[in-house]
UniProtKB/Swiss-Prot annotation:
Domain of life, source organism: Bacteria
Compositional bias of kind Acidic residues: 120-131
Organism annotation: Escherichia coli O1:K1 / APEC
Span list, region Disordered: 98-131
MF (Gene Ontology): small ribosomal subunit rRNA binding; structural constituent of ribosome
CDD domains cross-referenced by the UniProt entry: bS6 (cd00473)
GO BP terms, alphabetized: translation
Lineage of producing organism: Bacteria, Pseudomonadati, Pseudomonadota, Gammaproteobacteria, Enterobacterales
Protein name: Small ribosomal subunit protein bS6
Keywords per UniProt: Acetylation, Ribonucleoprotein, Ribosomal protein, RNA-binding, rRNA-binding
InterPro entries: Ribosomal_bS6, Ribosomal_bS6_CS, Ribosomal_bS6_sf, Ribosomal_S6_plastid/chlpt, Transl_elong_EF1B/ribsomal_bS6
PROSITE patterns associated with the record: RIBOSOMAL_S6 (PS01048)
GO CC terms, sorted: cytosolic small ribosomal subunit
Biased composition (Basic and acidic residues): 104-116
Family: Belongs to the bacterial ribosomal protein bS6 family.
Length: 131
């Protein structure tokens, strides 16, 4: 089986359907003896340019190992699903399991925010004890 990176963008009005779509696609892959190495739901993001007069879309990234028949089926599903604005399936040489730069940046921002909140809480406690 080959390794693939799949990115698809969903219409922003259909964002509530994304978990169900992910579940269906992962079930199709695992049902055909495939493996999912990475699954990231990036959420609703700004598009670089308008697509069908839309400025935002819900992004999903999947790195999978699957037979060609399943990938063909997924591409057909993407093509005929009106909620999917764009999709891209790329073959990769090996499985990608580490977090994408999008998720890494989000985690770093969260860590910095938590560190800042802890520092301000410590400063407030230190100020209270001095008085």
């Amino acid at each position: 089986m080959r390794h693939y990176e799949i990115v698809f963008m969903v219409h922003p009005d259909q964002s509530e359907q994304v978990p169900g779509m992910i579940e269906r696609y992962t079930a199709a892959i695992t049902g055909a003896e495939g493996k999912i190495h990475r699954l990231e739901d990036w959420g609703r993001r700004q598009l670089a340019y308008p697509i069908n007069k839309l400025h935002k879309a819900h992004y999903v990234l999947m790195n999978v190992e699957a037979p060609q028949e399943v990938i063909d089926e997924l591409e057909t599903t993407f093509r005929f699903n009106d909620a999917v604005i764009r999709s891209m399936v790329m073959r990769t040489k090996h499985a990608v399991t580490e977090a994408s730069p999008m998720v890494k940046a989000k985690d770093e921002r969260r860590e910095r925010r938590d560190d800042f909140a802890n520092e301000t809480a410590d400063d407030a406690e230190a100020g209270d004890s001095e008085e």
